[in-house]
Regions:
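Structural motif corresponding to alpha-helix initiation and N-cap regions
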Residues: 84-87, 137, 160-163
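Non-catalytic C-terminal accessory region of glycerolipid acyltransferases
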Residues: 2-38, 160-282
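Short, flexible loop segments at the rims of nucleotide/cofactor-binding pockets, characterized by
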Residues: 73-78, 152-157, 187-189
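Catalytic core of membrane glycerolipid acyltransferases/transacylases, capturing the structured
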Residues: 92-156
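Short, structurally constrained coil/turn elements
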Residues: 76-78, 92, 120, 172, ...
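Short amphipathic alpha-helical segments and helix-helix/interface helices
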Residues: 70, 116, 141, 166, ...
Length: 282
């Protein structure tokens, strides 16, 4: 169908208006979607990176369902995934923190397909927000709890378990996907400022950051929401190693800045325009 035949979704229009408002106000780390109310994740409710047989069975079922669901989205052209640029940068590392921009509920599965294509011998775990683990019902909740997820928590004791799991995941040569932008803005094309937590984890565990920035382009297709279906292209950068001759704060900031530089340079190269935000201060 053409865009004239499908009215644009009022919900999506409201989200875009909210994104524009938050950009003007510099509120880059705040979510714009109406997520379900969340609750605190307690330490006795989770065994991070659980390798018990029952957990492995749930993991296998969850990944099977997720792969089928994602395949169906691609078959129906609701998501169009293009060839990854720089795949060799991920194939050659052992443990690593992978960073990525966050713009779609399924972008972590875009990253799973990228990881699979790299032929990396280990697993990719993903850090998710607390409410995604505790409060999503049904099918999505099952995926959130069983697809190699490491949920954050507002409970201090749970966070201690989380950090121990991060150390184990990286020490075993696995990769850890983190969204340091912290917020998800639907199909937002610009890179957002990055929070420091991901870079602290890389520094503490002596592993590199492999930055990824996913660009998008309007296809000729129009989705059910009245907006053009996007063609997504993942761009992987060379591993960024911590400079351990620097103080920890300086080394962390260097990792963060180099990752931001990669995202900005990729944005400006692909879109052919300088990165500018419509903030009130600019």
């Amino acid at each position: 169908m053409t865009s004239q035949e499908i009215p644009k979704s009022p919900e999506r229009l409201a989200i875009l208006e909210k994104i524009a408002q938050y950009e003007r106000e510099g509120r880059f780390d705040e979510d714009v979607e109406n997520d379900p109310p969340s609750r605190v994740l307690l330490p006795e409710e989770i065994e991070y990176a659980d390798r018990r047989f029952s957990a492995e069975c749930r993991r296998t079922a969850a990944f099977g369902a997720a792969y089928l669901y994602f395949w169906n989205l691609r078959r129906k052209k609701e998501i169009i995934l293009c060839k990854t640029e720089g795949l060799e940068h991920l194939a050659g590392v052992k443990g690593a923190v992978i960073t990525c921009n966050h713009f779609h509920p399924m972008d972590s599965f875009i990253m799973q397909k990228v990881f699979d294509a790299s032929k990396h011998p280990k697993r990719m775990y993903r850090v998710i927000r607390e409410g995604n683990y505790t409060s999503f019902p049904g099918f999505y909740g099952f995926l959130m709890r069983n697809c190699n997820t490491l949920p954050l928590s507002s409970n201090m004791q749970t966070m201690k378990k989380f950090l121990r799991a991060v150390d184990w995941v990286l020490s075993e040569g696995n990769c850890l996907l983190i969204y340091p932008e912290q917020s998800m803005w639907w199909n937002y094309r610009k890179p957002k400022p990055l929070k420091p937590g991901a870079f602290d984890m890389a520094l503490k565990n002596h592993v590199p950051v492999v930055p990824c920035f996913i660009t998008m382009a309007d296809s000729d297709l129009v989705g059910g929401d009245g907006f053009p279906v996007q063609e997504y292209t993942p761009h992987l950068g060379a591993p960024i190693w911590p400079d351990e001759t620097l103080s920890r704060p300086a080394a962390r900031e260097q990792l963060r800045q180099k990752t931001e530089d990669f995202c900005r340079e990729t944005y400006e190269t692909v879109y052919g325009i300088p990165l500018r935000y419509e903030t009130r201060e600019s």
